[in-house]
Amino acid sequence: DVFGWRPWDVTTLLLKDFTDYGNAAARGSPNNAMIIDIAPLSLTYETFSPGERFFTLANHELTHVALMDVWNARDAGWRRFLGGKPMPLQEHPESILWNYLATPRVNVPRWYLEGSAVFFETWMAGGFGRAQGGYDEMVFRSMVRDDARFYSPVGLESEGIAVDFQ
């Protein structure tokens, strides 16, 4: 009970073998699910080799599910009213609002979800993992050396969406 989280519904685990490289995904809406590609992980651009890939992937993806599914009284009220956790559909733009009301934490910035999951996977591996990688240390040391600006979470989100990538 690390998270103090009571799941709204069961978490479905789908193991698949349709690719030549390992990966995983998680969702908290319309249901709790984890999908794991069982092929070996590609370590080409990684900063560490996981001791046991299913342990690492399960910790990482279950953190995503817990963060997206966690609920309070207001969320529970909307979930009961809407009959569950609606998934946003392109054909029904209003479903974006219903999804936000029932599962607001699904819509947090990606850096928050990924940062939390990477921290937890590293913690569960006894301090070995991507949260302690040399790459991150190099980036922060370079930023200090270059007197680069460290953004606050709000400033980072604002700056990140202000640039036109097209």
Per-segment meaning from a language model:
Residues 1-102, 109, 158-164:
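Juxtacatalytic substrate-recognition/specificity segment
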